[in-house]
Amino acid sequence: MGVITISSELGTGGVEIAARVAAELGYAFVDEHTSDRILRQYGLTKFEELYDSGPSLLDLVRVENLLIISMYNEILEALARRGKVVILSRVGFAVLGGYADALNVRIVAPMAQRVQRIVASHGLTDAAAAEEHLREDDIGHRKFVNRFYNRHSDEPGGYGLTVDTGTTSVDDATRQVAEAARAAFRTSAVAGATTTAAIEVDPVLASAIADVMGDPVPGTTT
């Protein structure tokens, strides 16, 4: 069935593109807020704070944080097992990169265009402040990926497709991702390839996902 992960820089239009791709393909759309709702069913309430802030070195040894990351990885795999889903995630490529039926996408844009988008979408007047905010967000993003996953969010081999919305419209980007997914999923059933169908999902987690997503993970009883 396939899963698409989308990693995007703030101000690139990645959220809109991910939602549009999901709508075009008839897939579910999942972002960090969805994952946070699932984690809260386990009493883990600090995911979004950790996700957005960029972890310190001390954060790496806190038991609660390590549990959050472990559970988040399980959630991403369980969502992938569900299939027909677009996951907006900084680390989807790191968690699901080994599956033949996962298309990992990176959305980027030059800083100047990102500033323009943020200024326009948030009604800001101070472009310098907007750029500073974007750079801080980039730093937090990179720290989260590097410190918890030992990966780099802009590594060339991490993605099957990279789209630059500095030169590509949101409409064209949506079309490119959807077409790439259709092509990738047609050729993913290669003999010996590891697919998301091999993922085993804990029944309790499957139930939590069903509560949030509205339908069960295939192959599980909730």
Residue ranges and their predicted role:
Residues 5-21:
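Glycine-rich phosphate-binding P-loop
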Residues 89-93:
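Short, polar loop motifs at secondary-structure junctions
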Residues 127-170, 201-218:
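Small-molecule kinase domains that catalyze NTP-dependent phosphoryl transfer to phosphate-bearing small molecules
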Residues 35-87, 124:
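ATP-dependent small-molecule kinase phosphotransfer cores
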Residues 100-121, 128-134:
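Conserved phosphate-donor/acceptor-positioning beta-strand/loop module used by diverse small-molecule
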Residues 24-30:
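Post-Walker A helix-loop "phosphate-sensing" segment adjacent to the P-loop in P-loop NTPases
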Residues 179-206:
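N-terminal presequence-like segments and adjacent domain-start helices
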